[in-house]
């Protein structure tokens, strides 16, 4: 089994599913080389629907090199409202051309602004704002420039088909972006919050410099880690590090470490604990690989969720209302359901209400939590940090097409899954190149 890059191992992604060398090559030579389009699953009314019943205006934005949070802030600032009144279903990467929905509360269609590098069209109105996961999935069109050995893609695909039980499959890891591409610390903040160590949470975000960020950022983080001089640190931190500067202002004004962490927008506060859950999930998936347990079919003790019958097969998601704990007598039956795409083997996104699997799968989860010094009760947290938990499929089966000249990948993934998790298998690059 091929070990992953150390940066990936630091976020729980310990292995590749394929042993073959990758194609190499470069991603995102230009934003147009990495296109992402939401597969929408959100009901709207006509744009002239009464605003009393439908206070949210829904727009579709095609963004060129915009981070989702930054665009939402720019949209809110341009129309003179709080960023908290802008909602979306999924966060997209800056270095791409992305098309996604945004919902804006109490905005008229005539007030939609023009924003640089963004094409915005009105879709309609809705009675509620978008929430995270309010989409069927995402469609990707990705071009790889100057691959070293594009012919290797075929061997990788064959190995992934063996891993996936006949069709190309990869571990459904949370990708590097979940934790921070160049500075993966969001899970460290989340783990500190779970341990009720707000000082460690704040300092994980403010300090902890990495060699992969600009030199002025590194110096600022080193300064604040060494001195705890909040006012002095404001003179060191570049203006572009907005969240850090807001935290420093709070600390300089006498606020607590928890107060500083709670200066983040509510969606980012949730992201910290979600990143910790994601790290635990990745560790569980990696340990399952290390033990040689299958991904495309269950073993006794697994918790299997049936597929959402309303979803397109390419982006089908597990349905929480239809699940089964696999006994020895049901392994073969459930394996057939999984093989046909009717069900998924799952692992937990641990929270207060998580029920552990039995047998080896349950032992793996308990072992990971014990190693991290965590329990389900630790997820019973105040405000935006609380999480009841859920489950997630451990196998990702992209509907994949590979073409050459140029080397390109086209596929669709369900909501919450990562294109880079597929691409890392084919390219075998440094995570920083993804």
Curated annotation (Swiss-Prot):
Q: Which InterPro entries match?
A: PsdUridine_synth_cat_dom_sf, PsdUridine_synth_TruD, PsdUridine_synth_TruD_CS, PsdUridine_synth_TruD_insert, TruD_catalytic
Domain TRUD, residue spans: 169-396
Q: Name one GO molecular function term.
A: RNA binding
Q: EC no.?
A: 5.4.99.27
**Keyword field:** Isomerase, tRNA processing
Q: Where is the active site?
A: 93 (nucleophile)
SUPFAM superfamilies (alphabetical)? Pseudouridine synthase
PROSITE patterns per UniProt: TRUD (PS50984), UPF0024 (PS01268)
Q: Which reaction does it catalyse?
A: uridine(13) in tRNA = pseudouridine(13) in tRNA
Name the enzyme group at the top EC level.
Answer: isomerase
Q: Which GO BP terms sit in this record?
A: pseudouridine synthesis; tRNA pseudouridine synthesis
Cite the CDD domains for this sequence. PSTD1
Q: Which family does it belong to?
A: Belongs to the pseudouridine synthase TruD family.
Q: What does this protein do?
A: Could be responsible for synthesis of pseudouridine from uracil-13 in transfer RNAs.
Q: What is this protein called?
A: Probable tRNA pseudouridine synthase D
Its source organism is: Halobacterium salinarum (strain ATCC 700922 / JCM 11081 / NRC-1) (Halobacterium halobium)
Query: Mind giving the lineage of the organism this protein is from?
Result: Archaea, Methanobacteriati, Methanobacteriota, Stenosarchaea group, Halobacteria
> Per UniProt, what is the name of the gene that codes for the protein in this document?
truD
